[in-house]
């Protein structure tokens, strides 16, 4: 996830952004290691113990549910903090800044979804996974981008970060609108009451974080019981935490919380999620499995849909005069970044688990598709960026 960026230019701005991307890429590398470890363990003699541990029940929920509904609420809270900061005072603060990543994010969500739907049309048991290839994993993408060092201009990394913020926003809306189960009206009303309390705290000018966190914990519980996915409590909480005025940046509750959360999310929450969700037994995977509609739709949605959707919409915006290429970059480098956006690991796996509850065989197929599509996208992106870095 993304650490806070300065809201005003300063002599140290470049150094700050450089440190930010170094930390981001480091988190991506840790996530890669966790995913690889999960695959190794799941296909070793420890595989049965690995899956048994994930299904062990603690306080009424399995370990897997605690990770996906509990820990990931912290991940989504950081997503919400980033969205609010960037829209109010960051890379998305003006319409001109939003244009290129906005068009790119739209194309990068629509085309992969259409590709998945094309492969799963007429299959009511699998069509609900249409949103799986629509997300980009920013930590993974920046981790891969870091392997290229100075071959990639900083402006492209900022573009990728802004695109990912809008991509995350789209994923949050998709989860809220399309992956909500049967609702409990009393619990939903209690959740709405909690949100009203958070808004009241904000309007009253409360700057202490503790009251927000206490009400946020209640909101998480009510959402868990209501049928709305509990992770959205993290987003709602984040959007109510005050950013403060530019001259109060040192005392900004939002920036303070974001700074504290970032290392925990990057180096604990997301790697734990990756380790718990990337493990899939390959013993039953055959050539026929790879061409099943779900893994094929997911893999091609990420590999083909992401790069085509992002590059085509970005090019359209640039040619129409609505946006311009990131400073110091060329068309080939923009295409390379679009290919890297096919790395859809964390959010794709998360949406896959929501799309097919109670269907572990389909979730395993999603994992195969996500892994294949993400790895091939990473390889293609690196090859393209290395090729065009020599010319640009």
From Swiss-Prot:
GO terms for biological process: regulation of pH. GO terms for cellular component: plasma membrane. InterPro entries: Na/H_antiporter_dom_sf, NhaA. It is a multi-pass membrane protein. It is found in: Cell inner membrane. It catalyses: Na(+)(in) + 2 H(+)(out) = Na(+)(out) + 2 H(+)(in). It comes from the Bacteria. One of its GO terms (molecular function) is sodium:proton antiporter activity. Pfam families: Na_H_antiport_1. The chain crosses the membrane at residues 20-40, 61-81, 99-119, 127-147, 158-178, 181-201, 209-229, 265-285, 298-318, 336-356, 365-385. Keywords: Antiport, Cell inner membrane, Cell membrane, Ion transport, Membrane, Sodium, Sodium transport, Transmembrane, Transmembrane helix, Transport. Belongs to the NhaA Na(+)/H(+) (TC 2.A.33) antiporter family. HAMAP family: NhaA. Na(+)/H(+) antiporter that extrudes sodium in exchange for external protons. This is Na(+)/H(+) antiporter NhaA 2. It comes from Pseudomonas syringae pv. syringae (strain B728a). The gene is nhaA2.
């Amino acid at each position: 996830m993304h650490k806070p960026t300065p809201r005003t230019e300063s002599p140290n701005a470049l150094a700050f952004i450089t440190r930010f991307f170094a930390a981001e890429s480091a988190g991506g590398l840790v996530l890669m290691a966790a995913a690889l470890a999960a695959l190794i363990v799941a296909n070793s003699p420890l595989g049965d113990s690995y899956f048994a541990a994930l299904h062990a029940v603690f306080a009424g929920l399995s370990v897997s549910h605690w990770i996906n509904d509990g820990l990931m609420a912290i991940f989504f809270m950081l997503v919400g903090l980033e969205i609010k900061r960037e829209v109010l005072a960051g890379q998305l603060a003006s319409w001109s800044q939003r244009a290129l990543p906005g068009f790119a994010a739209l194309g990068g969500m629509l085309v992969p979804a259409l590709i998945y739907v094309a492969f799963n049309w007429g299959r009511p048991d699998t069509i609900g996974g249409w949103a799986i290839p629509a997300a980009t994993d920013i930590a993974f993408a920046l981790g891969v981008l870091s392997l290229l060092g100075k071959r990639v201009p900083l402006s492209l990394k900022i573009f990728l970060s802004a695109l990912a913020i809008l991509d995350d926003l789209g994923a949050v809306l998709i989860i809220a609108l399309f992956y909500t189960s049967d609702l409990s009206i009393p619990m939903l009303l209690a959740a709405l009451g909690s949100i009203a309390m958070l808004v009241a705290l904000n309007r009253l000018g409360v700057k202490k974080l503790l009251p927000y966190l206490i009400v946020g914990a209640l909101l998480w519980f009510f959402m868990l019981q209501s049928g709305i996915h509990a992770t959205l409590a993290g987003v709602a909480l984040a959007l109510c935490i005050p950013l403060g005025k530019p001259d109060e940046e040192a005392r900004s509750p939002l920036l303070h919380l974001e700074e504290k959360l970032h290392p925990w999310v990057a180096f604990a929450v997301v790697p734990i999620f990756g380790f718990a969700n990337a493990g899939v037994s390959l013993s039953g995977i055959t050539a026929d499995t790879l061409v099943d509609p779900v893994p094929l739709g997911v893999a091609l949605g990420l590999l083909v849909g992401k790069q085509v959707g992002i590059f085509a919409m970005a090019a359209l915006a640039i040619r129409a005069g609505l946006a311009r290429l990131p400073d110091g970059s060329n068309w080939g480098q923009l295409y390379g970044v679009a290919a890297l956006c096919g790395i859809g690991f964390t959010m794709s796996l998360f949406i896959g688990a929501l799309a097919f509850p109670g269907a572990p065989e389909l979730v395993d197929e999603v994992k195969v598709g996500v892994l294949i599509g993400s790895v091939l996208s990473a390889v293609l992106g690196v090859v393209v960026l290395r090729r065009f870095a020599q010319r640009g």
